[in-house]
Curated annotation (Swiss-Prot):
Span list, region Disordered: 1-108, 283-515, 644-664, 864-893
Biased composition (Gly residues): 51-60
UniProt feature, compositional bias: Basic residues: 363-378
BP terms from Gene Ontology: defense response to Gram-negative bacterium; negative regulation of viral genome replication; primary miRNA processing; regulatory ncRNA-mediated post-transcriptional gene silencing; siRNA processing
Subcellular location: Nucleus
Function: Acts as a mediator between the cap-binding complex (CBC) and RNA-mediated gene silencing (RNAi). Involved in innate immunity via the short interfering RNAs (siRNAs) processing machinery by restricting the viral RNA production. Also involved microRNA (miRNA)-mediated silencing by contributing to the stability and delivery of primary miRNA transcripts to the primary miRNA processing complex containing drosha and pasha.
Lineage of origin: Eukaryota, Metazoa, Ecdysozoa, Arthropoda, Hexapoda
Recorded name of the encoding gene: Ars2
Keywords of the record: Nucleus, Phosphoprotein, RNA-mediated gene silencing
Phosphotyrosine modification, residue list: 79
Primary location group: nucleus
Coiled coil: none
Family, similarity comment: Belongs to the ARS2 family.
Any one Pfam family match given in the protein's UniProt record, by short name: SERRATE_Ars2_N
Protein's name in the database: Serrate RNA effector molecule homolog
Length: 951
């Protein structure tokens, strides 16, 4: 029998060998015997490594894991489960979750919803009432597109009846069931509030203080956008563009202009829109960043380069000559000064000039790229060299007389200068000014003096770097300390300026004229996974240490993402965004992997909408809808009024306001320029009399259709409204959506939808259907948000501030003994509870205020008709009777409970369950409600005596 068992087990393993090999590729090579014949199926004796040393084609016995690896530990099962031999199911990777993919515990190891305890409690109390069509409890739900949590399943009416007394009346049942549903909803709202009340996104919505601050911040953003729009409307930028997909470039230019204005840019910065976008960033490619400067400087300085090679071959090294084209003007001016000095005083000048040369070479190698950046960025580099000019050596002169004067100015500063030196300096300065070809301002005369600073001192100034940039006034302070020495130095420089007069204006232009800033283009990082407990301040503190950081935007959480949020971090365009992204990926915030990736630029910024929108009838309808949306949003944020921002009123107040007509209205009363005289374009016109006289009917038009009729005047009015909604309120009308928190996003005005190519003909039915359907899509903007009334929130469990304060006082009043009471807040003891009450209101007033704010916080959450909450359990949703009995798809539901309990048809009082897939035990409850009371039975006189007899 042993051989028979082995043979059976061999065949069983051989049968599933192919399936095992298909998903265990790492063991496929190990199963092949060493030296065995390739191709075809080998004999079992050759393939089996456990048959001894002679098996396997002459190879040595190999040590392989036992087949228990496939079966698992324990005794060998003769008929194993087929699941064990099947390939493992594919595990989908979640982009935003970090955990085992189960709903709980969440948020780093704790479960704020207490879903585990609730499920256990619900299983113990209602284990017999799970309907067959109900999904399993939350902890056993399959992962479907993310960890979507739901509320616990609420008992339906039939399940609730089984928990009540049999003699209860119908009215009492309905009353108790209504109370049960109300209490259930209150409990869910309260649990959700307790779970999320400490999170930033929840506070920004409902906290009495944080929500007001957030609303004021948003109102400030809108006011800034309004100012930009009015400015563009007045200068004709808005009126010169059409919201058509064929005018995409003009639309993009308008949006970019708005972004530059919102970023604080000037009209000079708008010139960047006329330039071609640069593919390579300046600071990413350092050698290429100075190409324009190098080309300009090469032409006038080529004679000087040849002269240097002839006169000073020993002093000027080949490295220094090679650095001339790419370095700033400082080194070039120094070279020009060095070349003329040795013929006059070789004994004195050469030792002084040769000393700083090795230091210059070392510093130039280290700080070459640093100097290029500073020369390209602003004119602070020249100011740094000017501040160190008074301390430089005598190597900055061209002629002997000028060099002598400069030496005296350097070393005789403490003793002062004589009057003769001052007169000579003024005379030389006047002659140099006349010799110049172009008129140079006094500020420009100092620029060659700045660039002629000693290389050694300049290198020291460059080492200071940021300190020199932060103190641009250092050159003025040096001049004040040195007295009139600056005058002598400025007199010594014009001769040098004559020799290189062509280069000096170019250098001044590069330093003084700030290039237009590319403010409408940014680099950004997308954070896929942010826990609800992470605040915006923590993200800002983490990213502010990177250069070029601008702002952070965090989206509202989504229930299908386990209330995790997404974020966008915006940087300037010139940063190395990939390096920053790599740094963020190596960091964890509150034990949460943020999942940072580089956010790509927008691909299509102007996207086409239906071309039927250009028809005159549709345009007039769109003007009405746009005007209503503009009025609602302006009134919501009080953009054109000076009053404080008010919250939406309750439903009763808003209805009364609408009935009285006291709200905003079309026409001349509005301060909004896009709404003025809007009524002139809202009146429809038709040639009704002409059609009647000529006998024209609309039947032929409906059959054949009519061509698209464009009215440019109406289109211009509509374009102003559409652009106002897009720029000010971030509402894309032709996409019937709003782009939230756009002022914090990387692209403040990124995408807009415009009218696409129009069809040749359109029927009236298509027009009417389009107008009707589009109005339904915009319903969220057309209706005002009405908060729930006081009576409505009372049904949801609203709290009273005085009642909660009283509960707070009672909770902090503890009786220790007779006439001995304790206040836990302070630890003090009192003789009576009334003294503790006074003590709490006097000494712990901030605690009482927190209780009142908490009550207002909770009530604000209840008033919101669109409040966030967990979705209802699928089992609580009403379904057709056929589906509930037979299960989804018409198939019979499983006979066992999903809660790991015994089958419902197992013994005792549960004998009535299981029939037809119903899982609630008493069979008598399967009848309709009206038949649950007082059943009239039929008693057959001929029946046996042990038959059932109804009363």
């Amino acid at each position: 029998m042993a051989d028979s068992d082995d043979e059976y087990d061999r065949k069983r393993r051989d049968k599933f060998r192919g399936e095992r090999e298909s998903y265990r590729t790492e063991r496929r090579d190990e199963r092949r015997p060493i030296g065995g014949a390739g191709g075809g199926r080998d004999e079992w004796s050759e393939r089996n490594p456990f048959r001894g040393g002679g098996a396997g084609g002459g190879g040595a016995p190999r040590h392989r894991p036992d087949y228990s690896d496939y079966r698992g530990p324990g005794p060998r099962a003769r008929y194993g489960s087929p699941v064990r031999d099947m390939p493992p199911p594919k595990r989908m990777r979640s982009d935003w979750g970090d955990g085992d993919g189960r709903p709980g515990p969440r948020y780093g190891g704790y479960d704020p919803y207490l879903m585990q305890a609730w499920t256990d409690h619900y299983q113990s109390m209602h284990s017999a009432y799970h309907h067959a069509s109900h999904p399993p409890p939350v902890r056993e739900l399959p992962i479907i597109g993310g960890d979507t949590l739901t509320q616990p399943a609420m008992l339906n009416l039939k399940q609730f009846l089984d928990t009540q007394d049999e003699n209860i009346s119908d009215s009492e049942v309905m009353r108790k069931y209504t109370e049960y549903k109300t209490d259930f909803k209150r409990q869910q709202l309260n649990e959700f509030f307790v779970a999320h009340k400490d999170e930033e996104w929840f506070k920004n919505k409902y906290h009495p203080e944080d929500s007001v601050n957030r609303s004021e911040e948003q109102r400030g953003f809108l006011r800034r956008r309004t100012d930009v729009f009015v400015e563009l409307l007045e200068n004709g930028t808005i009126g010169s563009v059409k919201v058509d997909s064929s005018h995409g470039d003009a639309l993009i230019r308008v949006l970019d202009t708005c972004v530059i204005k919102l970023e604080g840019g000037t009209d000079e910065d708008l010139k960047v829109l006329d330039e071609k976008p640069k593919e390579a960033l300046v600071f990413d490619r350092k050698p290429e960043s100075v190409d324009p400067t190098t080309v300009v400087e090469n032409t006038p300085k080529s004679p000087k380069k040849e002269k240097e090679e002839d006169e000073l071959p020993l002093i000027v090294s080949p490295q220094r000559i090679a650095l001339k084209p790419v370095n700033s003007d400082d080194e070039n001016w120094d070279d020009a000064e060095v070349e003329d000095a040795p013929p006059k005083k070789p004994e004195e000048e050469e030792p002084k000039e040769s000393e700083p040369i090795p230091e210059i070479k070392q510093k130039q190698k280290k700080e070459k790229k640093k100097k290029i950046k500073k020369r390209k960025r602003n004119s602070s580099s020249d100011e740094e060299s000017s501040s160190s000019e008074s301390e430089s050596s005598s190597s900055s002169s061209e002629e002997e007389e000028e060099d002598d004067e400069k030496l005296k100015a350097k070393y005789d500063v403490e003793d002062g200068l004589r009057a003769e030196q001052k007169a000579e300096a003024e005379k030389d300065q006047a002659e140099a000014a006349k010799a110049k070809l172009g008129s140079v301002s006094p500020k420009e005369e100092i620029s060659p003096e700045k660039s002629a600073a000693d290389p050694e001192v300049e290198g020291e100034a460059k080492e200071d770097g940021k300190q020199a940039e932060k103190s641009p006034k250092s050159d003025d302070e040096k001049k004040q300390e040195n007295g009139d020495a600056a005058k002598v130095e400025s007199a010594a420089e014009p001769a040098t300026g004559d020799a290189q007069g062509e280069v000096k204006p170019v250098t001044i232009d590069l330093d003084k004229v700030n290039p237009p800033r590319d403010m409408h283009r940014t680099s950004s990082i997308f954070l896929r996974n942010l826990a609800p407990s992470i605040t915006k301040a923590e993200i800002e503190a983490l990213c502010s240490r990177f250069s070029g950081y601008l702002r952070t935007a965090i989206a509202d959480p989504l229930v299908e993402r386990r209330w995790y949020r997404r974020g966008w971090i915006t940087f300037t365009r010139d940063v190395n965004i990939k390096e920053i992204c790599w740094s963020l990926n190596n960091q964890r915030l509150r034990d949460c992997e943020m999942g940072a990736i580089v956010n790509r630029d927008l691909s299509r910024r102007v996207r086409p909408a239906n071309g039927i929108t250009a028809h005159k009838q549709v345009v007039r309808s769109d003007i009405k809808l746009c005007a209503r949306i503009v009025m609602n949003l302006d009134e919501k944020f009080k953009l054109w009024s000076e009053g404080p921002l008010s919250k939406p009123s309750p439903a009763s107040d808003s209805e009364a306001t609408a009935a009285n007509g006291s709200g905003s209205s079309y026409g001349f009363n509005s301060k909004n320029p896009v709404l003025q005289n809007i009524t002139d374009y809202l009146i429809e016109e038709a040639s009704a009399e002409e059609e009647e006289l000529l006998g024209l009917s609309g039947d032929r038009k409906d059959g054949e259709g009519e061509p698209i009729e464009r009215d440019e005047q109406l289109l211009s009015v509509l374009d102003r409204l559409v652009l106002y909604l897009r720029i000010v309120h971030s509402v894309d009308y032709y996409n019937h959506c709003e782009y939230p928190y756009e002022d914090e996003m990387p692209n403040r005005c990124g995408i807009i939808h415009a009218r696409g190519p129009a069809p040749s003909r359109v029927t009236s039915n298509e027009l009417n259907e389009y107008i009707k359907s589009y109005e339904g899509k915009l319903l969220q903007f057309l209706t005002k948000t009405a908060l729930l009334s006081e009576d409505q929130i009372k049904d949801l469990g609203a709290k009273n501030a005085d009642t909660e304060v009283e509960k707070f006082v009672q909770a902090n009043t503890q009786e220790l003994a007779k006439d001995k009471w304790l206040c836990p807040l302070s630890g003090k003891k009192f003789k009576g509870p009334e003294f503790i009450r006074k003590h709490i209101f006097n000494k712990h007033e901030e605690k009482v205020d927190e209780v009142r704010k908490e009550v207002q916080y909770f009530n604000n959450y209840l008033r919101d008709p669109k409040r966030p909450q967990l979705p209802e359990h699928p089992g609580s949703v009403k379904r057709p009777e056929t589906e509930s009995v037979r299960g989804p798809g018409g198939y019979r539901p499983p006979m066992y409970t999903p809660m790991s309990g015994m089958p419902y048809s197992f013994g005792g009082h549960m004998m009535g369950g299981g029939r037809g897939g119903r899982h609630f035990p008493p069979a008598r409850r399967e009848l309709p409600l009206e038949h649950h009371r007082r059943l009239v039975g039929y008693h057959d006189l001929d029946a046996p005596s042990n038959s059932d007899i109804f009363d």
